[in-house]
Curated annotation (Swiss-Prot):
Disulfide bonds join 30-482, 68-293, 80-92, 113-155, 297-321, 489-493. InterPro entries: Capsid_hemagglutn (IPR008980), Hemagglutn_HA1_a/b_dom_sf (IPR013828), Hemagglutn_influenz_A (IPR000149), Hemagglutn_influenz_A/B (IPR001364). It holds the Pfam family Hemagglutinin. It is a single-pass type I membrane protein. This is Hemagglutinin. It comes from Influenza A virus (strain A/Mallard/New York/6874/1978 H3N2). GO terms for cellular component: host cell plasma membrane; membrane; viral envelope; virion membrane.
């Protein structure tokens, strides 16, 4: 019996210790921060995996699947390559004098005129693409003693034989092909592009039938350059019924310079010039459909948004585009360190502060207060510290975009087979640039994430220290982000602490008096829950023993009878 009395007193003492925290003479005030059940993992300088409440994806990994025609002027090449449109292939006549920001070449494009080759195809294609126009000005060249406007069955224009509309095929007149010597000055204030060619017959007989001389020659000169081409007579693989070829060349004539053409045969003469413009027009191979929409950035896969600093859709881009990197995802922390709230807090559901964990459900701020006093419990956000953290984080994404978005385009690189080593070197340089930017992106984002987490932790600590300085000796730091206030603190008192108007002198005497009274017989809070559980278990055990003893005593007295039937 004495044992039961002692344990009952011990249980009551522990129970009264818990209740003493919530009596009318004390209060508990905790500081905490926002938390979510499932956060987002980000990378920092010191930790590859740290959970935050919120993060923004920085890598654009998908396209719209279509090319937007605004704000860039897109010219759909359909079944015409840019060079075919330049030369005037009959099925490309619709592109005469067209302009563009981006010329889109399709995989289905084809040539449908006299078979030709361009020894410096990539340079000519790039030159015309960057000019952004096929504006053509016809000039009055004088070709005396030869037949003009030659045609071929390989280049039908309507029902009859035709030829490239921007070129003039010259052949003998009668039995003569005199030496041609024609000049054309550039008296304008812009560059002029002249496109011309050399015809390569398949046999010597064909050479003399067309040009009389057994071997022709074409020389095109300016003050800055000279090109002399000797035809290569011989049969080639058949293309559209022809084993002959035309080689296409080009010459740029600067303002004040002069074009000189000298030939004794095999000349495919220019009919005029293309007006060259300077700009940032370009060309791209893509089969993505063109649609009415708005996008600053275009890739062969389609347009992509440029609201992210990085993309891994395609290395080839046009417009103001995110930087291409290898990573498929990089997350920028836009929230604080996430510590999900514990679901249980001891036997009596005590509140706890930020040192233990965060608070879920705090929707009106990132930082705040929870209190427990004689009027109950409550919660309120601290908007000042919340706004201070948000202001420092808000500009991060825009700053990263400004550092990385390209305001120019990355064009396709093309080289002929003989320039293989140059192509390999160029590919190595491009791959190295991508590797470097991928590494830079990793470091940049990790640094920004580290800064975000540090500054949000700092705001929490600032709020805690501000509260500590207000309360002074009127409260005790409980070590978990909470203060035990040793005086009666109703809701108005709690509000004064939150808004910074608390006057500790008013409550000083009461707090000192209560502190000594409570500490005189207090049980250390770290062992309270253990004592309560042990006391409860022993009490239950003793209750069972007493009940069993009562049953045995009743059986002996005959008050309870137990019959066992077999």
């Amino acid at each position: 019996m004495k044992t039961i009395i002692v344990l009952s007193c011990f249980f009551c003492l522990a129970f009264s210790q818990d209740l003493s925290e919530n009596n009318n003479n004390t209060a508990t005030l905790c500081l905490g921060h926002h938390a979510v059940p499932n956060g987002t993992i980000v990378k920092t300088i010191t930790d590859d995996q740290i959970e935050v409440t919120n993060a923004t994806e920085l890598v654009q990994s998908s396209s719209t699947g279509k090319i937007c025609n605004n704000p860039h002027r897109i010219l759909d090449g359909r079944d015409c390559t840019l060079i075919d449109a330049l030369l005037g292939d009959p099925h490309c006549d619709v592109f005469q004098d067209e302009t563009w920001d981006l010329y889109v070449e399709r995989s289905k494009s084809f040539s449908n005129c006299y078979p030709y080759d361009v020894p410096d195809y990539a340079s000519l294609r790039s030159l015309v693409a960057s000019s952004g126009t096929l504006e053509f000005i016809t000039e009055a060249f004088t070709w005396t003693g030869v037949t003009q406007n030659g045609g071929s069955g390989a280049c039908k224009r309507g029902p009859g034989n035709g030829f490239f509309s921007r070129l003039n095929w010259l052949t003998k007149s009668g039995s003569a092909y005199p030496v041609l010597n024609v000049t054309m000055p550039n008296n304008d204030n812009f560059d002029k592009l002249y496109v011309w060619g050399v015809h390569h017959p398949s046999t010597n007989q064909e050479q003399t039938n067309l040009y009389v001389q057994a071997s022709g020659r074409v020389t095109v000169s300016t003050r800055r350059s000279q090109q002399t081409i000797i035809p290569n007579i011989g049969s080639r693989p058949w293309v559209r019924g022809q084993s002959r070829r035309i080689s296409i060349y080009w010459t740029i004539v600067k303002p004040g310079d002069i074009l000189v053409i000298n030939s004794n045969g095999n000349l495919i003469a220019p009919r005029g010039y293309f007006k060259m413009r300077t700009g940032k027009s370009s060309i791209m191979r893509s089969d993505a459909p063109i649609d009415t929409c708005i996008s600053e950035c275009i890739t062969p896969n389609g347009s992509i948004p440029n609201d992210k600093p990085f993309q891994n859709v395609n290395k080839i881009t046009y417009g103001a585009c995110p930087k291409y990197i290898k990573q498929s995802t990089l997350k920028l922390a836009t929230g604080m360190r996430n510590v999900p709230e514990k679901q249980t807090r001891g036997l009596f559901g005590a509140i706890a502060g930020f040192i233990e964990n965060g608070w879920e459900g705090m929707i009106d701020g990132w930082y705040g207060f929870r209190h427990q006093n004689s009027e109950g419990t409550g919660q309120a956000a601290d908007l000042k510290s919340t706004q201070a953290a948000i202001d420092q984080i808000n500009g991060k994404l825009n700053r990263v975009i400004e550092k990385t978005n390209e305001k120019f385009h990355q064009i396709e690189k093309e080289f002929s087979e003989v320039e293989g080593r140059i192509q390999d070197l160029e590919k190595y340089v491009e791959d190295t640039k991508i590797d470097l930017w991928s590494y830079n992106a990793d470091v940049l984002v990790a640094l920004e994430n580290q800064h975000t987490i540090d500054l949000t932790d700092s705001e929490m600590n600032k709020l805690f220290e501000k509260t500590r300085r207000q309360l002074r000796e009127n409260a005790e730091d409980m070590g978990n982000g909470c203060f035990k206030i040793y005086h009666k603190c109703d809701n108005a008192c709690i509000e004064s602490i939150r808004n910074g108007t608390y006057d500790h002198d008013i409550y000083r005497d009461e707090a000192l008096n209560n502190r000594f009274q409570i500490k005189g017989c207090g049980v250390k809070s770290g062992y309270k829950d253990w004592i309560l559980w042990i006391s409860f278990a022993i009490s239950c055990f003793l209750l069972c023993v007493v009940l069993l003893g009562f049953i045995m005593w009743a059986c002996q007295r005959g008050n309870i009878r137990c019959n066992i039937c077999i």
